Each structure stands twice: as C-alpha cells, then as structure tokens.
Amino acid sequence: MINEIKKDAQERMEKSVEALKNNLLKIRTGRAHPSLLSGISVEYYGAQTPLNQVANVVAEDSRTLAITVFDKELAGLVEKAIMMSDLGLNPMSAGTVIRVPLPPLTEERRKDLVKIVRGEAENGRVAIRNIRRDANGDVKALLKEKEISEDDDRRAQDEIQKLTDAAVKSIDEVLAVKEKELMEV
C-alpha cells in the first residue's frame, strides 16, 4: 500500500519535472532550436494544425531556423502565424523555405526571460510540494484506518520527503542550466 503511494508520487513528480523541461524549451535563448516554434499552430483546411505537422523545422545555424513547408500554399500562412506569435520573430520566405533569423537578445530581455524561467521553476516546485501533500495525506488516511503503524507512517513520510527533495533538486539543476544558457552572450 505504502509502496504504491510512493511509486505514484514519484511518477507524478517525474512528470512535473518533464513538464517544466518542456515549458523551458519554448523560452527563447540566444540559440536557434526547432522546439522554439513548437507552440505555433497554422490554420490548415479550417483547423488549427501544429506547425510540425505541416512543415519541417530545422536549425540552419546558431541564429537561424529553416522551415520547409510541405504544401507551397501554406508558406504565407506559416509566415503569418510566426509573425503573430509573441516570439518577436520576422520570417523571410523564399518559395517553400522560410528562414527565421533570431535577433540577439538584449540584456534587458535576458533578465526578463530569467524572471520568467524562475517563475516556471517555482511553479514546478509548487507542483512537487502539492504531490508530496497528497501522498502524505494518503499515508495519514492509512494510519487513521489503522492499516499501518505510526512507525510505518513516519518512515513513509521520510521517504516521500526524500523523493520531494530529489525532484526539487532536479528542478533547480534544470533552472541553473537554463539561466546559464540565457545569460550567455
């Protein structure tokens, strides 16, 4: 019973860390990375379609993304979708290939992005603590129903705390890497 609670908590904590990593991928650093455009959708045959389903996105060099559109008619729509996004990018079209040069980040913008990244990391920590609270509540319920002893309760809470500490530590490591990436000129 306790092992199931711990396993569930650990899986949920790992998912929270992965979700944070995915959220941070969408925050632009100075380098071009295809995942930067992963949140962009294009109007295609009356439905919003993710960019990666209508085009191929690759990093041409450290400052340029190249988008190869599968359907030539979509080039204008893809270009418009990128301009309408809040990424502040100006795509240039050349037939079926759209090049997106990434302007260098200003110091002020870097600091703003670091604040955003820290906020995302804090949201991740809050999610981890909520998972800990849920797991501890489940263990307390077992104790209340006299299915486990107080010693088992204490031991389970200590183990859940260790899982929490490990998850928070990995969030802090992800945050440190992203901050370093952002502050590199």
From Swiss-Prot:
A molecular-function term among this protein's GO annotations: ribosomal large subunit binding
Major localisation: cytoplasm
Gene3D superfamilies from the UniProt entry: 3.30.1360.40, Ribosome-recycling factor
Annotated keywords: Cytoplasm, Protein biosynthesis
Entries under InterPro entries matching the protein: Ribosome_recyc_fac, Ribosome_recyc_fac_dom, RRF_sf
Annotated Pfam families: RRF
UniProt subcellular location: Cytoplasm
NCBIfam families registered for this protein in UniProt: frr
Function: Responsible for the release of ribosomes from messenger RNA at the termination of protein biosynthesis. May increase the efficiency of translation by recycling ribosomes from one round of translation to another.
Protein's name according to its UniProt entry: Ribosome-recycling factor
Organism taxonomic ancestry: Bacteria, Pseudomonadati, Pseudomonadota, Gammaproteobacteria, Vibrionales
